[in-house]
């Protein structure tokens, strides 16, 4: 196969090199999450935590593929966000922001890394206190974790996206929680964080997606967000939005000099992946970004909120649909949970959890170190899954 033909062929998991790049990106983002968690202490500034996560990813990816002839793009695939309590997502404030985390806060950490455009994302929920998590906080995290475990077992060749949407809603209901509307799980491809195959969190008349079947050698970002509230989050303040992605298919002649300046900087620095306004020349950024968003040159990732007092949990993971089964490559162990609800009397949920993630190989192929594949059904709902 000539180089040109190879370029044209879409790179997927049939290439061992591609699998390695996904797993390397996953290893880095898992470590970045661990680092940010270790820095989450009462009174820590959220912006400092976010910057530490991004800096670690940049440093670690920068050390890879240094000596190859062809330049390999690598770095942050989604800026580190830390969304607290009833804030649902995308909180990654500017350097001037003084918001801190407090004892007892429910922290949702979300981040992504890529190597050569092969993306690994992770989302995790942590309560900032010692000892087991109890009450409704434990319920909402257990609901999210159990839904993630069920999704892992249903995102497999032959199953449909609608199967996952229905199942995760049933899991959340068992814990008297709601899956949050508007959260999408996407197929990912090289340099594409939000591919065309989509899993809805909640199916309703307002949000329709094409029915799709999962196929071998695909990669998905599975994104589960659960709330003790009504699961219909609102945008409260557009000024909180700091994460954007360039819309590569749109063009417009910007009128303002500040907009042209900032869009030129974005096109050079962040042509494809989502980025944070923190990484732009901040004084001009605010002014220029508005016109870019108004004319759809940039897709904003808004900061959404449930009602005050609602608790929101988030788990996101990357899964590779390999020929021998599903390989969850990003995760982090949860704290001990003592939920008030259980799925003990939910045979359908128990049956989903009993599904294996790996297909049994004849003659037992080489096994990698401790993936908890087929044993999750023995664990309680509160048990974390380490990937």
From Swiss-Prot:
Primary location recorded for the protein, binned into one broad class: nucleus
Recorded GO CC terms: nucleus; ribonucleoprotein complex
UniProt-recorded Gene Ontology molecular function terms: RNA binding
UniProt xrefs under Pfam families: Peptidase_M24
Effect of a null allele: Growth retardation leading to small dwarfed plant and reduced tuber yield. Young developing leaves contains a reduced number of larger cells than controls, whereas at later stages, during expansion growth, the cell size is abnormally small.
GO BP: auxin-activated signaling pathway; cell cycle G1/S phase transition; regulation of cell division; regulation of cell growth; rRNA processing
Location of region: Interaction with RNA: 356-373
Subcellular location: Nucleus
This protein's UniProt keywords: Auxin signaling pathway, Developmental protein, Nucleus, Ribonucleoprotein, RNA-binding, rRNA processing
Region (Necessary for nucleolar localization): 1-49, 297-387
Region (Disordered): 337-387
Keyword Ribonucleoprotein: yes
Superkingdom: Eukaryota
Keyword Manganese: no
UniProt short sequence motif Nuclear localization signal, positions renumbered to this chain: 360-369
Basic residues bias locations: 358-372
Tissue-level expression: Expressed during tuberisation and in roots, nodes, internodes, petioles, leaves, stolons, tubers and sprouts.
Region (RNA-binding): 47-55
Subunit structure comment from the entry: Component of a ribonucleoprotein complex.
Family note: Belongs to the peptidase M24 family.
Classification via PANTHER family: PROLIFERATION-ASSOCIATED PROTEIN 2G4, PROTEASE FAMILY M24 METHIONYL AMINOPEPTIDASE, AMINOPEPTIDASE P
Record's function text: Binds RNA. Associates with 28S, 18S and 5.8S mature rRNAs, several rRNA precursors and probably U3 small nucleolar RNA. May be involved in regulation of intermediate and late steps of rRNA processing. May be involved in ribosome assembly. Required for expression of cell cycle genes such as CYCD3-1, RNR2A and CDKB1-1. Promotes, in a dose- and auxin-dependent manner, organ growth by stimulating both cell proliferation and expansion, via the regulation of RBR1 levels.
Name of the protein this chain belongs to: ERBB-3 BINDING PROTEIN 1
Organism annotation: Solanum tuberosum
